[in-house]
Amino acid sequence: MTEKICAVDLGMPTLLEAAGAEESAALCAELGLQFVELNMNLPEYADPAHMDREKLCALREKYGVYFTLHLDERLDGCDFNPLVRNAYQETLRRALELAQEAEMPIVNLHLNHGVYFTLPGKKTDLYAERREEYLQHIDEMRRIGEEGADENTALCVENTDGFLAQEKKALDLLMKSKRWGLTLDVGHMHSAGYVDDDVYIVHSGKLRHMHLHDALLMQAGQCHLPLGEGNLDWRDSLRTAEMRHCRAVIEVKTLSALRDSVKTLREAGK
């Protein structure tokens, strides 16, 4: 196994070029990383009930790496259609069962913005219009997390392009729970112009996880860049991760970008 890069546990995302669990684990160990974030948007991991727990545990022992879980980005436990909502909530339950059985410390998810209507002169978010109903379903998600996760697993909400007003209320509710925390995607934050700084200040004690990659300021299409190819102060982000005892996924999209980022980290002494 290659020497660890820094004090922070660093991980890799699931890559299309190495999507299998064993292929990912072997690459992770080769690069000197500590974990793989399995992505449920991929068919191999879409239904956590059908993921082989024994295999994941065996890979953990074989390669000396562990796994975290990234829920389907479309997951929406607040959908107005109860069939859809219940399916997504059941997916969350199954994901938490998997996390317990495969010793996954992090289950990462997005807050789905939901549907919006474009009206003359404005855009109307339905979750904003039906805020109370939306927050009721958020509370259902909170309870699922509290019932399904133990003290070794955190459900972490990731920032994307800026939390909406009703989502900030949702975070106020979720962050009251010991089982819920925050993922800071530093590239998303940078490319969105730091619109979510207030959230991470208010809930500063809830940071549990980080997605680390370079980006260009205020350019959403230039977000998941290899470290050193944007204008983000990723060294400061790593210092934050160390200070807060967070794990960090080097969340780039290709194998070459991952190798380049690992090389940059090693050359920087991090």
Identify the meaning behind each predicted range.
Residues 33, 66, 154, 181, ...:
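Hydrophobic "anchor" residues on beta-strands that sit immediately upstream
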